[in-house]
Amino acid sequence: MKGLRLIATGGALPGRTVTNEELSRTVDTSDEWITTRTGIQTRHYCTEGENAATLAVAAAKQALQRSGLAPADIACCVCATLSAPDATPSVACQVQAALALPENRPALDVNAACSGFLYGTAVARGLLATLGGRYALVIGTEALSRLMDPADRSTCV
């Protein structure tokens, strides 16, 4: 988007790695079938205590550290997710609290599935323009392993 620049990234993965071979023991599929059609060999499932918010906090901490910015520099926090662990507080508000971002700055979630991060970036751009801020924290996080049926081949593969 014109006028925006990415200055740092962060990342976090859930703790459990699930292979195609493991999936083939519970649903009608094979490693070869999955790999040939999707290229996927492993996926990550949340373990106890992990969810979209905990992953967002971990990734955001890493991004903030890499950016060299202080929490006070962040004008807004926008989190793109469709798998928030709770309706309220929003994942963005949980990140805001965990990173000690200023409480008087906007923190909100955007629910737009696969395109969520792009929409979140557009929302952050609008907030920066409106608020006069310089830096936004935009997060994309999902914990779909919490929502899917591990016995349903159409969603677990």
Describe the function of each predicted region.
Residues 25, 65-71, 85-157:
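Acyl-thioester C-C bond-transforming condensing/cleaving domain
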Residues 75-82:
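Short glycine-rich or small-residue beta-strand-to-loop segments that form or flank ligand, phosphate
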